[in-house]
Amino acid sequence: MHWYDTNGNPQYEIKKKDGGMRATTLRDARKHGWVPSVTTVMDIVGKPGLEVWKVNKAIESAMTVQRLVGETYEEHAKRILAHSRKESEQAAKRGVRIHNELELFFRKACIHSADMGDYETDIRKICDATKSVLDVNCGEQGWISEKSFCHKELGYGGKIDLYSKEWVIDFKTKDSIEDKKQLAFDSMAHQLVGYSRGLNGESRRMANVFISADNPGHVIFHEWPQDKHELYWNVFTSALDLWKHMKNYRPEEFNNEGS
């Protein structure tokens, strides 16, 4: 879970008593009046497609990971589960890495080149292709990268991949993207509208940019229809209200009391 303070600053970790750091919990958030992120809110809603994918990966791992001599059922099951999670963990790390490079690119900083060779070449292809598809579909924009915010009145926050006065953009990195394969799902629009309205309450055009990690330079732009923005917003605010009921925590009330 990700959290933000009332100034929009990320509060993903908190100091431990021994001086180290640990992930912020709901209990910590209650104490400080921190708000949940858009993605944390949307996690309260089931994702059937994702669950099917996880089950399929577990089945594949069960067929691949052989039971060792003398290994108990529980030990074997743990290895199968770890194997099934490995691919998604690697994909998540790669996605974070690409997001970080895109942030530098749109902030006009130098592309990170700690890993030289093919990696740097691939990253440049991804960044250039992303910029090109945005130029074609959005025109010239004053892009702002990785902006965090807090909507004090509704009690949620988040960090936006890219936005301007007219647009809110969220990047989605995938192993491969095929032109005829469905990439965009309504849950992505629910996430985007939370970002869009969370900035200052104004409506913006919303789009996902799907980025291929296996074929650097292949990107697909998907805009969400403007006539459905209000429907997406109703879904998001319903999820937000459900989250507050389930967690028995309304940060906007905490922060109003403290003001």
Language-model-detected regions and their locations in the chain:
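Metal-dependent nuclease catalytic cores that hydrolyze phosphodiester bonds in DNA/RNA
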Residues: M1-Y156
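Mg2+/Mn2+-dependent nuclease catalytic core
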Residues: W143-E252
